[in-house]
Amino acid sequence: MSMQTAPIKKITLSHLQAKKNQEKIIAITAYDALFAQIFDPLVDVILVGDSLNMSFFNQNDTLSASVKMMLYHTKAVCAGAKTPFIITDMPFGSYKDEKTALKNAIRVYKETQASAIKLEGGKEKAKLVKTLTDEGVIVVGHIGLMPQFVRLDGGYKIKGKNEEQQKKLLEDALSLEEAGVGLLVLEGITTPIAQTITQKIKIPTIGIGSGKDCDGQILVWSDMLGFFDSFKPKFVREYLKGKELIQNAIQQYADDVKKGNFPNELESYH
């Protein structure tokens, strides 16, 4: 009689770390219960990203996202997705010092069912990471192209193109690992250094625009499902023409209403 493994009820950090060098981690963003529920059986990780400020609220960058906003959307995602490991982005300004970071991270844990918080920054954030992990908070790191630094950097610029940047990225990764981050997001860095970092550190890397050698991949759902046609980053693969499909459906609905074809007898009460 063959032994069957029981299905995982909730993916934990241990499950994800066990995938290192074994099986790719599948991650996606979500901002509400509806899409979180759709994604639930298909992904390992859901990130409630501050990217919602751009894709959900149509802002130019992520910087005006607030803790209140992130808590609201994290609650919604947790209501829809029961199995994936759920990560909440700490928005700009919410971890400017240890006291502020602890206060906001503890709020995330107390007010939502999030599995972890994510913050941007390299070795300069190592002390903060240790403080948070010492309090029982799972921290996900994020290095490379960091959207919260877009104004300082003068735009969305790929990192790791020269030796100095590559050295810094590796130092950042090693420092964050030592400080206790459970996972590390690599965004917008060149493939060779992403591969090196993935090989050098023991925790899983999740890439976005950082080549295929990372331990996992993440995309913003509205990018990969074709909801934005004004701009598409090079690293995005579009798996659906979502905007077009929905507009076609709404057009059919509008046509039916105008022609008196909706509602029909079967869709009416008597």
UniProtKB/Swiss-Prot annotation:
User: Which GO biological process entries does UniProt record here?
Assistant: pantothenate biosynthetic process
Cofactor: how and how many bound: Binds 1 Mg(2+) ion per subunit.
Which InterPro entries does the UniProt record give? Pantoate_hydroxy_MeTrfase, Pyrv/PenolPyrv_kinase-like_dom, Pyrv_kinase-like_dom_sf
Quote the record's binding site residues for Mg(2+): D50, D89, E120
Q: Self-association or partners: how does it assemble?
A: Homodecamer; pentamer of dimers.
Family per UniProt? Belongs to the PanB family.
Q: Which protein are we looking at? A: 3-methyl-2-oxobutanoate hydroxymethyltransferase
Name the encoding gene, please.
panB
